[in-house]
Each structure stands twice: as C-alpha cells, then as structure tokens.
Amino acid sequence: MFADNQMISGRQCARLLFFDFLGIGTLLLPGYLADVAGEDGIFAIAFGVAASLLYLKLLQKIVLGREETFLSGAGGGIAKAADGLLIALYGLYYVLLGGYALYLFGTLIQRTLLVEESFWLITLLGLVLAVYGMARGMESRARVYEVLFWLVLIPFLLMLLLAVADVSPQQQFPMATAAPGDVLQGAYLVFLVFSLCQMLLFAGNVISPEKAGRAAGSAILFAGLLFAVLYEILLGVFGRVTVSELEFPAVSLMSMVTLPGGFLHRQDALMVGVWFFTLFALICSSMYYSCQCMEKFRGKSVLWRGIPVKKWILLLCG
C-alpha cells in the first residue's frame, strides 16, 4: 500500500523533472543548436548545463532563505505586493508553457500518427487527459512516471545505440569554428530548457527544498548528457545543414533506424510514445503549478474551480 500524503520522494522529483526536460529538449534543441552553433553545439550544451546548475544553486538559496513557502506571501506592504506580482507572472508563464507544450503534443501526434485527424481534436483529447492527470495530484503522477521512467528511456537509448552504426565522424568536425557569440546563444537555448527547474520554487508542499535541489541537479546532469549524445549522433547521421532544416530531427532519426530482425516496420510510431509521455508530463506540470499560483489569490479550492477556465486558456494558447 502507498501512503497517500501528497508528498513525493527525491527520486520521483528527479524523474518528473527529467521528463519535463526530455520532451521539449530533444524535440527542439538539436535543430536550433545546429543552426546557431553547428559542430560546436556540444560546447553550447556543456555551457548551458553549467549555467543551469548555477541557476539551480541560486534558486536553492532563495527557497532555503525563506521562513515560509514561496507561495505563502510572507512579509507585508511592498514586499507582499512584489511577491504577489511575481507569482502572477509565474502563473502566466506556466499557462503559456503548457499551451506551447500542448501545441507541440498535437503537432507531433498529428504529423506522425494521426495524419487524417483534426489537430484541435487531438489537442482537446490530450488536454482532457492532462486535466485528469493533474487533478489526481502530484503524488499520483510521480508514482506513474516512476514506473514509466525505464519503460520510456530504455527504447530511446536502444534506438540511439542502433543509430550509432550510421554515424559519419567527418560530419561532426571540424569543431571550435563557431563564433563565441553563437556558442553562447546556443548555451542560452539549453539554459531555457533547464530553467524549468524553477518549478522547485512551488514544490515546497510536496517535497523539501533540500531534496528538490538534489533531484533537480541530477535531472539536469542526466538530461544534459543525453542531449549531448543525441546531438552528436544527429550530426553524424544527417550533418549540420540537414539537422538545422528538419522540424523534429530526433523523430526523423527514429524513423530511419532499423531494428534487428525487421519485425517492426513503424518503430518511429512506437518511439513517438517517448514524446507523448514527456510532453504530457510537461503539460500536467504546467497546469499544476499555474493552479498553485492561482491558489495564492483565490484559496485552496481554486485547484478545482480553475480547471475549466484552464482548459480553455491552454487550448487557446495551443
């Protein structure tokens, strides 16, 4: 039996954050990095990871330095008003983030699996599922993704391993040719993905700040390593120009990898499941934390009263 205390462990927190990073990062980063940094994209990833870890340390100091939770609105007067404004901005940020993740979710499913179906129908069904998942609470979602972690990750790693056979090392070189500004621009893009670790500001009600900080750090390092491996494989298989032109390079890579035995002809359809679960996790997280921000202004019952409004907001954003 599981304890129903709405608390999550450090491992569960790390896996939830990893899923949030993995979906949007593997879909978008390779093309952007190839466009701005080319063969030096690997350095941009390294710098982006380093900057994200420093940012995480700053967040930890902010959270640990407060006597109350970030959402409690400690203090009064100007301080309380500033807190309220900041939380409102974070709430808007999570609404927009959830809307964009929902857009990616619908676009990917339609273009790879359900070509004949309506984009709006796909996103609406995904949104209904996300609302249900969010309403079940953080602890329930954490349990689900703890179980799904290796079920999703092992096929992804297997496909990367099989893709190594098609890598042409000459397409990964020469390195150290991009302008420093281009590498820094790429690092900033990586940092934007990992800046999702700011969710720990609002996670004080489900996990201690110390555990959340360690979990976020491990998730950043693991995801950063995976981004680097994926990027180098994509460069070696497609080359810089092709990677920069493909809409979803990682999905294209999965579609061309052949499994031994040839018993599965549409393994790309199977691999879309990776992004189905990871983008779904990001949508649920965005909804959960935006509702946490709404609680600040409308009371605890907002988590339920805000759901119908949130559905329409996210749908419009998508």
PLM regions and their residue ranges:
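Short, Lys/Arg-rich, polar N-terminal cytosolic tail immediately upstream
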Residues: 1-8
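Hydrophobic, membrane-embedded alpha-helices of multi-pass small-molecule transporters
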Residues: 10-28, 44, 48, 52-55, ...
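Membrane helical hairpin/interfacial module
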Residues: 25-119, 128
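Juxtamembrane helix-boundary/capping and inter-helix hinge elements in multi-pass membrane proteins
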Residues: 38-41, 67-68, 78-82, 205-213, ...
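Small-residue-rich segments of transmembrane alpha-helices in multi-pass membrane proteins
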Residues: 78-89, 148-163, 222-229
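Helix-loop-helix connectors at the membrane interface of multi-pass transporters/channels
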Residues: 102-120, 208-226, 286-316
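Membrane-interface loop-to-helix entry segments
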Residues: 105, 120-121, 133-163
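Membrane-interface interhelical connector segments
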Residues: 237-268
